[in-house]
């Protein structure tokens, strides 16, 4: 087996110790598992790959923390000091740990027990070591990452009708600005439901989910098929 990509023992011990200090400062004396959260959301952006607003993840954060995880904020969420203050040591960014952003991001991506967040570079980096990933707002529809639960963006025609699954897997599998569809990120309720399902699956894996035959509709050259 190929050994996991990790920081040096010295750097890992440094960050691990500061995570523990942050928990204790917030009144949390017990150890915690680690969740890396990645956001790809830019305020007022109309880009088709923009993720969900970070505030839409807050109920999910509460659920994740309730399951014993400390959350490391990466991506566009990293500057949200208000979330660090709100969750008292169970949500941290690089400023809270007084370390560089590069060190923070590399530790989070390579040491976390789980990943939760938007599709994008942060998800791909975390896939190197993380066994369980929940990737929200995946688009284009052919994209995927290994070992992940994938929740795609919502897609509908210009008249508001939802795009059928078989068309997402074929006609609209790749991004084309000429497509006559609109895509929208998952909302707060979608995210919370996805996180609850994800955490339950980690604790007690099911034998399978209905609709698995539909996966065969996806192009064989797609990342979605190759990662399953």
Each language-model region and where it sits:
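Catalytic donor nucleotide-activated moiety binding site of glycosyltransferases and closely related
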Residues: 32-43, 54-101, 211-223
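Conserved nucleotide-diphosphate donor binding/catalytic pocket of glycan-assembly enzymes
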Residues: 1-6, 29-36, 140-143, 147-148
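A donor-sugar binding/catalytic signature common to diverse glycosyltransferases
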Residues: 104-153
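Well-ordered, non-membrane alpha-helical segments in soluble/globular domains
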Residues: 52-60, 109, 191-193
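Leloir-type glycosyltransferase catalytic cores
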Residues: 1-24, 148-228
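Short, solvent-exposed loop/turn segments at secondary-structure boundaries
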Residues: 47-50
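Polyanion-binding and phosphate-handling cores
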Residues: 80, 87-94, 123-125, 131, ...
């Amino acid at each position: 087996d190929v050994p996991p990509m990790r920081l040096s023992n010295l750097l890992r011990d440094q960050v691990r110790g500061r995570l523990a200090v942050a928990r204790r400062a917030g009144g949390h004396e017990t150890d915690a598992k680690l969740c890396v959260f990645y956001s790809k959301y830019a305020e007022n952006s109309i880009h088709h790959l923009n993720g969900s607003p970070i505030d839409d993840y807050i109920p999910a954060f509460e659920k994740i923390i309730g399951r014993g995880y400390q959350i490391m904020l990466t991506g566009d969420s990293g500057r949200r000091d208000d979330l660090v203050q709100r969750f008292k040591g169970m949500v941290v960014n690089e400023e809270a740990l007084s370390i560089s952003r590069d060190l923070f991001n590399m530790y989070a991506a390579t040491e976390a027990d789980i990943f939760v967040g938007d599709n994008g570079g942060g998800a791909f980096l975390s896939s190197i070591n993380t066994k369980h990933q929940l990737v929200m707002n995946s688009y284009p529809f052919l994209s995927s990452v290994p070992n992940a639960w994938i929740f795609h963006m919502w897609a509908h025609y210009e008249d508001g009708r939802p795009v059928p699954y078989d068309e997402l897997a074929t006609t609209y599998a790749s991004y084309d600005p000429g497509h006559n569809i609109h895509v929208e990120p998952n909302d707060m309720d979608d995210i919370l439901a996805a996180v609850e399902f994800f955490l339950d699956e980690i604790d007690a894996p099911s034998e399978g989910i209905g609709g698995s035959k539909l996966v065969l509709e996806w192009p064989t050259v797609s990342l979605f098929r190759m990662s399953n």
